[in-house]
C-alpha cells in the first residue's frame, strides 16, 4: 500500500510543481522505527530483553529504545529505532512479530517495504529531525536568482540559514538585526500591498492585520521578529512559527501543520527586485500567511491538511500539497457576493493580488478530489483559482477527502501533550469517546446557563 517506487537522496522538486519529495540521504532518515507490544508486556516479564536478544542475534544496531504506557493494549509498548543498513533487519522483524500482540513499522525510506508506514512525527519536538532537510541551503542559489551574482546577499543568506539550522524546538526564536537595505525592501512591499488589502483581501485578513500592527510591529519601517509574531499566534489559535532555511519536502512541511507549526523563513528577497521572489521569503510568510493563522477557522482548516498527510502514501501527499497550493497559497473565497483573496501567494504579491479578482483567470468551486489533481504553473500568475464558500466548508470537504486516504489508522492531535495520537485500537477509541463525552457535558452545562 505504501511502497514507494523511487527514492531521492535529497529533497527533490517533482516536475514543474510545488511538490517536493523528501530525501533519505542522512543516516537518521535511513533508520527504521518499530512500535510494538509484546504478548506479555509487563516491564517485569523480561519480554523486552527477549526481543532485544532477537535484534542482537541478527546483528541489528539499535540507536534508540523507549518504553511507554500503551493506549492499545493493557501494559506497555516499546518504540525501537534500528539502523536500517545493519544486519538482517527483515529476518529480525519477522521474528519479533511472532512475539508481539501489536507491531507496526514506520520508516523514512520505505521503497522496499510495502507494509511500512511512512515515518511521521509523533511529538512536536520530532520536528527537529527533518527541519534542516531542505531543497537548497543558504547561499546555494539558482543561476536565475536575482541574488546569484551578489556575494554580499549570498553571505547574508548563509547567515539566515545558519540561524535556522541551529534552532531546536523549545528555544526562543532567534532575533535578527535586519540591515537598512533589507528594511527598505520590506517597506516597498508593505507600502504597496497595504493599498489593496481593504478591497482585495478577505474579511478575516482585514480583521487580524490591524492587530498585528498594534501587537507585533507590522509597519513600513520595521520587519517584525518571528518570536513576537509566534507569541501572538499562540495566544490566538495555538499556531507557532519555526525558522527554516529554505523549502522543506511537501511531506515534512505538511506534517508541521498537524502540530500547528508553520515553518517560516527569515531572509528577505534581493533588493534589485522587491516586487518579485522565486521562493518564499519573510515578506511572503509575514504578509501572506501569518494573518490568517490567527483566525480560528483557517487555523483548523490548515491543521486538517497537516493531519491528513501523516502516514499518507506519496500520491496522496502530492494531492494534499496541490490542495494546499490552491487554498492556503492561492485561495479565493466568496464573501457577501464578492470574490476576496485569502491565499498567501496572492496576499504577498501586489501584481497577482490585483490580477486574481479580474475577469482574466478561470474560477472553479473548490472540490478537493478535483483540486488535488489539477496541474498549475509555479513561475507565472495562476490561470485558474478554486473558490471556497468559507473556511468552514473548505475544512469539511478536506476532512471528507482525508477519509479516502488509505492508511490503517486515524490520527488526533492532543494539544495537552503536543503530540499526535494514532487511533488504531478499541481502547484508544473508547478513551477518545470518554474525552468527547466530557467536553459535551461542559457544552451542555454552558448552554443551560445561557438559558437561565
Curated annotation (Swiss-Prot):
CDD domains on file: ACT_AAAH, eu_PheOH
Amino-acid positions noted as binding Fe cation in the UniProt annotation, renumbered to this chain: 284, 289, 329
Activity regulation remarks: N-terminal region of PAH is thought to contain allosteric binding sites for phenylalanine and to constitute an 'inhibitory' domain that regulates the activity of a catalytic domain in the C-terminal portion of the molecule.
Pfam family, one: Biopterin_H
Record-annotated ACT domain positions: 36-107
EC number(s) stated in the UniProt entry for this protein: 1.14.16.1, 1.14.16.4
NCBIfam families cross-referenced by the UniProt entry: Phe4hydrox_tetr (TIGR01268)
Name of protein: Protein henna
Taxonomic source organism: Drosophila melanogaster (Fruit fly)
Amino acid at each position: 500500500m505504501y511502497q514507494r517506487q523511487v527514492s531521492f537522496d535529497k529533497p527533490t522538486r517533482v516536475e514543474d510543481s510545488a511538490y517536493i519529495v523528501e530525501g533519505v540521504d542522512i543516516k537518521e532518515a535511513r533508520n527504521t522505527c518499530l512500535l510494538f507490544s509484546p504478548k506479555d508486556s509487563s516491564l517485569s516479564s523480561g519480554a523486552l530483553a527477549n526481543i532485544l536478544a532477537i535484534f542482537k542475534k541478527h546483528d541489528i544496531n539499535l540507536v534508540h529504545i523507549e518504553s511507554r504506557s500503551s493506549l492499545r493494549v493493557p501494559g506497555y509498548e516499546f518504540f525501537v529505532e534500528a539502523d536500517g543498513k545493519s544486519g538482517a533487519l527483515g529476518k529480525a522483524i519477522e521474528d519479533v512479530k511472532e512475539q508481539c500482540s501489536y507491531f507496526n513499522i514506520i520508516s523514512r525510506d520505505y521503497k522496499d517495504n510495502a507494509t511500512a508506514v511512512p515515518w511521521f512525527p509523533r511529538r512536536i519536538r520530532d520536528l527537529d529531525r527533518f527541519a534542516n532537510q531542505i531543497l537548497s541551503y543558504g547561499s546555494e542559489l539558482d543561476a536565475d536568482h536575482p541574488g546569484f551574482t551578489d556575494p554580499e546577499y549570498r553571505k547574508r543568506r548563509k547567515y539566515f540559514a545558519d540561524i535556522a539550522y541551529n534552532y531546536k524546538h523549545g528555544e526562543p526564536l532567534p532575533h535578527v538585526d535586519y540591515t537598512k537595505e533589507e528594511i527598505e525592501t520590506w517597506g516597498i512591499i508593505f507600502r504597496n500591498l497595504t493599498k489593496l488589502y481593504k478591497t482585495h483581501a478577505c474579511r478575516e485578513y482585514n480583521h487580524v492585520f490591524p492587530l498585528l500592527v498594534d501587537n507585533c510591529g507590522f509597519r513600513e519601517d520595521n520587519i517584525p521578529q518571528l518570536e513576537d509574531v509566534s507569541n501572538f499566534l499562540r495566544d490566538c489559535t495555538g499556531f507557532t512559527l519555526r525558522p527554516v532555511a529554505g523549502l522543506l519536502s511537501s511531506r515534512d512541511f505538511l506534517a508541521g501543520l498537524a502540530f500547528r507549526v508553520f515553518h517560516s523563513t527569515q531572509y528577505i528577497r534581493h533588493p534589485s527586485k522587491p516586487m518579485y521572489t522565486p521562493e518564499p521569503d519573510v515578506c511572503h510568510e509575514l504578509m501572506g500567511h501569518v494573518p490568517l493563522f490567527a483566525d480560528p477557522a483557517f487555523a483548523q482548516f490548515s491543521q486538517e491538511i497537516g493531519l491528513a498527510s501523516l502516514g499518507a502514501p506519496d500520491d496522496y501527499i502530492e494531492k494534499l500539497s496541490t490542495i494546499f497550493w490552491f487554498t492556503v497559497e492561492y485561495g479565493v473565497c466568496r464573501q457577501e457576493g464578492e470574490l476576496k483573496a485569502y491565499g498567501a501567494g496572492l496576499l504577498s504579491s501586489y501584481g497577482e493580488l490585483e490580477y486574481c479578482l479580474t475577469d482574466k483567470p478561470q474560477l472553479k468551486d473548490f472540490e478537493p478530489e478535483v483540486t488535488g489533481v489539477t496541474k498549475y504553473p509555479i513561475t507565472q500568475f495562476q490561470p485558474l483559482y478554486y473558490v471556497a464558500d468559507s473556511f468552514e466548508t473548505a475544512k469539511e470537504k478536506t476532512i471528507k477527502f482525508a477519509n479516502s486516504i488509505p492508511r490503517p489508522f486515524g490520527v488526533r492531535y492532543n494539544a495537552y501533550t503536543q503530540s499526535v495520537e494514532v487511533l488504531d485500537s478499541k481502547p484508544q477509541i473508547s478513551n477518545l469517546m470518554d474525552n468527547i463525552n466530557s467536553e459535551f457535558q461542559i457544552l451542555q452545562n454552558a448552554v443551560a446557563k445561557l438559558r437561565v
